[in-house]
Amino acid sequence: MLQYQIDRIEHQVEEDRSQSGVFLIGPLERGQATTLGNALRRVLMGGLEGSAVTAIRIAGVNHEYATVPGVREDVLDILLNCKELSVNSRSPELEIGRLVVAGPAEVTAKDLQFSSQVEVVDGNRSIATVADGYSLELEVHVERGVGYRPVDRHSEDTSAIDLLQIDAVFMPVIRVNFTIDETAVAEGGSARERLRMEIVTDGSITPDDALAQSANYLIELFQPLATVTLVEEPGIEPEPSAEAQIPLEELNLSVRAYNCLKRAQVNSVSDLMGFSYEDLLEIKNFGSKSADEVIEALERIGISIPQSRTSA
């Protein structure tokens, strides 16, 4: 297997604190770049844990179609602005941020007061505009999760009339693109590839960490396959043949032979198939004549038994 290296050739932090990074991965065998690129992209875009605003509460508001006195934006606009906040929570529990701002003022994300477990990535993100003589009191709920979580209208969490739920987008990676370049090889060598991958995040995670977390996710996903243990299914016992199910009475044996076999708990051909000729001779009052009679009766229906136990 080829030993490849990973180089980050670009890294930028935008005004809104989003980050982008470009990575070169190679050299790779033909086809491996596509395998890596597709797998990493799927995890980066939907498999990483992130933080998002999941609900807000506005003082004096009990539904999303209301307006707030003295606030330029209606409640739907405030909901959308809060949904777009980039936050990074290090707590597995629900975190709540609060603000009370008196106008005139432009309310931004940096006005929210959270515990030390939550970082507001872009503090300049606008939330609302409050006019002179009015104020805005706002509560923002932040949680961690994976992927996209729509509002569950039937959940107990939505029962509070003044708690406005938000469809949560927990994905910290905004965009992933990759291209594949062929690299020069020595004469006679096989073709090599190089994967060029661009990762753009919302700033709550660096592109480097996003790539590393995706790789670890895939390692954990595939690791059990390396030690898979095959469990053999128990064998299915074959059903006895029709001949084996023939009752002892239908063999038309002599009364002496029949009675001796019955006393030995032999009731069908299936029971006789567990005997050898020597075993028959050991049955009480069962002589060679009776044993020969049984052998002949079995042969008539196409069944034979061994002469001795060792040949069974």
From Swiss-Prot:
GO terms for molecular function: DNA binding; DNA-directed RNA polymerase activity; protein dimerization activity. GO terms for cellular component: cytoplasm; DNA-directed RNA polymerase complex. Its EC number is 2.7.7.6. Keywords: DNA-directed RNA polymerase, Nucleotidyltransferase, Transcription, Transferase. It catalyses: RNA(n) + a ribonucleoside 5'-triphosphate = RNA(n+1) + diphosphate. It is an enzyme of class 2 (transferase). Residues 246-312 are annotated as: Alpha C-terminal domain (alpha-CTD). One of its GO terms (biological process) is DNA-templated transcription. Residues 1-229 are annotated as: Alpha N-terminal domain (alpha-NTD). InterPro entries: DNA-dir_RNA_pol_insert (IPR011262), DNA-dir_RNA_pol_RpoA/D/Rpb3 (IPR011263), DNA-dir_RpoA (IPR011773), RBP11-like (IPR036603), RNAP_asu_C (IPR011260), RNApol_insert_sf (IPR036643). Pfam families: RNA_pol_A_bac, RNA_pol_A_CTD, RNA_pol_L. In cyanobacteria the RNAP catalytic core is composed of 2 alpha, 1 beta, 1 beta', 1 gamma and 1 omega subunit. When a sigma factor is associated with the core the holoenzyme is formed, which can initiate transcription. DNA-dependent RNA polymerase catalyzes the transcription of DNA into RNA using the four ribonucleoside triphosphates as substrates. The N-terminal domain is essential for RNAP assembly and basal transcription, whereas the C-terminal domain is involved in interaction with transcriptional regulators and with upstream promoter elements. Belongs to the RNA polymerase alpha chain family. This is DNA-directed RNA polymerase subunit alpha. It comes from Parasynechococcus marenigrum (strain WH8102). The gene is rpoA.
